[in-house]
Amino acid sequence: TTYLNIHELRKEMGSPNLDLCTEEIEEIPYLVSLSDRKIPITFFRIPNKEKQSAIVFIHGGGYIGGSTLVLQNQCRFLAEQSGATVISIDYRLAPEAPFPAAFDDCKDVVKWLVHHADHWNIDPNNLSIAGESAGGTLAVSCGLSEVGKYLKLVIPIYGALDVCSASDLDYWDYDLYDVIPEHKKYVITRLNRFRNLNGT
């Protein structure tokens, strides 16, 4: 039996990326203290005195990896381009913290932000949530939960939202999608990883 080395897998997540910001962006790490645990978050914002809208951004990583560090430049750029305060959540990861730990962390951070909005100079009536991959799924889950009433907008970026069984995925055909010819083999190899996870 081959076992997955979770620590090695986590080290491989993310890829080098550029900081595209042209303005100064503040990064403020903070530890949200709840009655039973602490959740690390990071605020990204243009440093000014104005009350800002807020975007909670949830990283991807298949619920087993990823972190704010992987998407640091993306969060900085989102803050610069939107003028909003971006809050990245370092939710608990599986397998050390199985479901619903990540979901609970994200929901609890949204609640905490609403109750501490004045302290962080954010507008609790203009709070959105976004995420990519597993983070997109967590964002939608938050939007459908009891904290959804606080959210003005939910933005899933390629979240796992299809409820079809793996046997229903045979319609997939790579030829239906335009790919730069020299990148095709690489793209197919990457996409096949997801199909192989489902045994299809």
Segments the model singles out, each with a brief description of its role:
Residues 2-14:
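Short, basic/low-complexity N-terminal boundary segments at the transition from targeting/disordered tails
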Residues 4-5, 19-200:
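Alpha/beta-hydrolase superfamily serine-hydrolase fold, recognizing
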